[in-house]
Curated annotation (Swiss-Prot):
Cu cation B binds at H171, H175, H202. The lineage of its organism: Eukaryota, Metazoa, Spiralia, Lophotrochozoa, Mollusca. Hemolymph. Its cofactor is Cu(2+). PROSITE patterns: TYROSINASE_1, TYROSINASE_2. Hemocyanins are copper-containing oxygen carriers occurring freely dissolved in the hemolymph of many mollusks and arthropods. This is Hemocyanin type 2 unit a. Its main location: secreted.
Length: 407
């Protein structure tokens, strides 16, 4: 079984080997090479088939099979690295811990020597990064990492479908805040997978799903099934299920149904060096989540998201009856003109308890509203009408089931 390690735990020998192997893979112009595999995600579009008159990107977003599609995609690239001599699995970048710069394994200022920095895609452009300030400085000014807090809300969910929505939208912000306004980078659905950082990011995304699965086992709850997108779970993922001319990997082609990809250890042949989160074991993490649920009443803003044909950064303010507005939160949408149509069937939720307290508002008041600002990847403003107005839900602490007052 292949071991996936934290990028910060790689030895110098492992780093040099991975860089050498990645360089070879990027120079491989066959169907086994980096660019051929990267095209599975976005451009050039391969779905429903390479021969179709009208094609879309094959990547799955806004659907219950998002985790499975990206699990098998990351495995596809990992297997290609192994084919060129890699001895460790796809390393992961644990972005749930606070950071002020990208890991030394994936810098963005060493463009000539490190093949994990950038490559040339099929349109003869280099991938580029435009890290946004929010990536390194918590936009909400919280005590912990922005990403850590959002991940806790995802891990708190006890139903796969609720978890998936939270989990997916969190991952979008890493894409957007690294790629920024660059066309050929992490913030565009079409070109994101041409940046090698994509796979380092998604190795961690997959690890977080594995942590949730272990939490579910600890809770005695289902960890390998979905009660939403039931038909999707039976449909082979594309383009992995296409012919060997598109996908020469016999393993991913044979195991391309989402329902077969819940058990990554058995089917994908890799493990993680640790399934802890910020040093917490599964049992400690569950205890922490239960404490979070019991400590105080919470207020959540909910958004029913759908594809808008573009990647976008969304910020929203909470405004009172006098139009006094305070920043309430931010999230991102990952998309583009080649995306499959999608819409979530449930709300993405963000904890807005803090801003309700600051503004001395109650969630059962009627005289408040959210104002959204939606900025497209290119930096242009989009109409807030593209997204449905946010709703509010109140979740009482488990110890005291009192009236919804968060003052």
């Amino acid at each position: 079984s292949l071991l996936r390690k934290n990028v910060d735990s790689l030895t110098e020998e492992e780093i040099l080997t991975l860089q050498s192997v990645m360089r070879e893979l990027q120079n491989d112009s066959s169907e086994h090479g980096f660019q051929s595999i990267a095209s599975f995600h976005g451009s050039p579009p391969l779905c429903p088939s390479p021969e179709a008159n009208k094609k879309v990107a094959c990547c799955v977003h806004g659907m219950a099979s998002f985790p499975q599609w990206h699990r098998i995609f990351t495995k596809q690239m990992e297997a290609a690295l192994m084919g060129h001599g890699a001895k460790v699995g796809m390393p992961y970048w644990d972005w749930t811990t606070s950071f002020t710069k990208l890991p030394r394994f994936i810098p963005y200022d060493d463009e000539q020597l490190n093949p994990f920095v950038r490559i040339t895609d099929l349109e003869d452009h280099f991938t580029t990064r435009d890290p946004q300030p929010e990536l390194f400085k918590d936009p909400e000014g919280g005590d912990e990492s922005f990403f850590f807090r959002q991940v806790l809300i995802a891990l708190e969910q006890r139903d796969y479908c609720d978890f998936e929505v939270q989990f997916e939208v969190i991952h979008n912000s890493i894409h957007y805040w690294i790629g920024g306004h660059q066309k050929y980078g992490m913030s565009t659905l079409e070109y994101t997978a041409y940046d090698p950082l994509f796979f380092i990011h998604h190795s961690n995304v997959d690890r977080l799903w594995a942590i949730w699965q272990e939490l579910q086992k600890y809770r005695g709850l289902p960890y390998d099934e979905s009660d939403c997108g039931v038909e999707l779970m039976r449909e082979p993922l594309q383009p992995f299920a296409q012919t060997s001319a598109t996908n020469p990997n016999n393993v991913t082609r044979a195991h391309s149904t989402p329902k077969s990809l819940f058990n990554y250890r058995q089917l994908a042949g890799y493990t993680y060096d640790t399934l802890t989160l910020n040093g917490m074991t599964i049992s400690q993490l569950e205890s922490s989540l239960l404490r979070l649920q019991k400590e105080e009443d919470r207020v959540f803003a909910g958004f029913l998201l759908r594809g808008i044909g573009s990647s976008a950064d969304v910020t929203f303010d909470l405004c009172d009856k006098d139009e006094h507005c305070d920043f309430a939160g931010t999230f991102a949408v990952l998309g583009g003109p080649l995306e499959m149509p999608w819409s979530f069937d449930r709300l993405f939720k963000m904890d807005v308890t803090k801003v309700f307290k600051q503004m001395r508002l109650r969630p059962d008041d009627s005289e408040y509203h959210f104002e959204l600002e939606v900025t497209a990847r290119a930096g242009t403003d989009l109409s807030p009408e593209l997204l449905k107005p946010g709703s509010v839900s109140f979740l009482p602490g488990r110890k005291i089931q009192n009236t919804p007052d968060v003052r």
